[in-house]
A protein has these predicted regions:
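Adenine nucleotide-associated cytosolic modules
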Residues: 1-215
Length: 215
């Protein structure tokens, strides 16, 4: 299906993924299974029992362990020859990660402030960034996600915040993955999630990334 040249592009492309939760863990899994062999993953969190329903990194044996270390082990089990770098830290304005060394940044962070900072740093370093929007509080429809410029998004509350942010900071183009499907309102402060929404979002993100790389 792919030429030797296209496969080499997948192997050599340097990707960094921020966040290894419901969306991020599936993104990492799909990237490596698609031939990506140079991957850096960033997350500060540990695996919780509540992650079992939707995060592909989580299982009964690794509750309490660092997500990035467990994710790295899982990915190397898929491709032992891959170069997987795990960074166990919370991304914020104090981060010292050199984004200029990467070809593609994938943002799967929940924290809005961190998202904004990461977007600004990606643009400052002229590195392509693809951001995930909301996948929670949805369950009753077959998931439908799309990639669009932030200015073209609707319905998504995270995208609404970022549209304003990008306009204020004169960011003319930002690719995001989002859904027009409206979230269900619950009497609960915690955002609920079922596995097929974040995984379908991850599949959409990876499809965009792979096609961008191979042309």
């Amino acid at each position: 299906m792919l030429s030797a040249e296209q496969v080499e592009k997948l192997v050599s492309t340097r990707i960094i993924v921020f966040g290894t939760g419901g969306v991020g863990s599936a993104v990492c899994n799909f990237l490596v299974r698609s031939g990506i062999s140079n991957l850096t993953i960033v997350d500060f969190d540990t695996i919780d029992i509540t992650n079992l329903n939707r995060q592909l990194v989580a299982n009964q044996t690794n509750v309490g362990k660092l997500k990035v270390e467990e994710m790295k082990a899982q990915l190397l089990n898929i491709n032992p020859n891959a170069k997987i770098t795990a960074i166990a830290e919370k991304y914020d304005e104090n981060s010292t990660i050199d984004l200029s060394q990467f070809d593609i940044i994938i943002d799967c962070i929940d924290d809005i402030k961190a998202k904004k900072h990461l977007i600004m740093q990606a643009k400052a370093n002229n590195v392509y960034i693809l951001c995930s929007m909301g996948a929670g509080n949805r369950y009753a429809e077959i998931p439908k996600f799309e990639i669009a410029d932030i200015s073209k998004t609707s319905y998504d509350p995270i995208a609404k915040i970022l549209r304003k942010f990008c306009a204020e900071n004169r960011i003319n183009k930002l690719d995001v993955c989002y859904t027009k499907q409206k979230a269900t309102k619950f009497d609960c402060k915690t955002v609920a999630s079922v596995v097929y929404y974040p995984v379908m979002m991850a599949g959409t993100i990876v499809a965009k990334v792979i096609t961008k790389i191979v042309g």
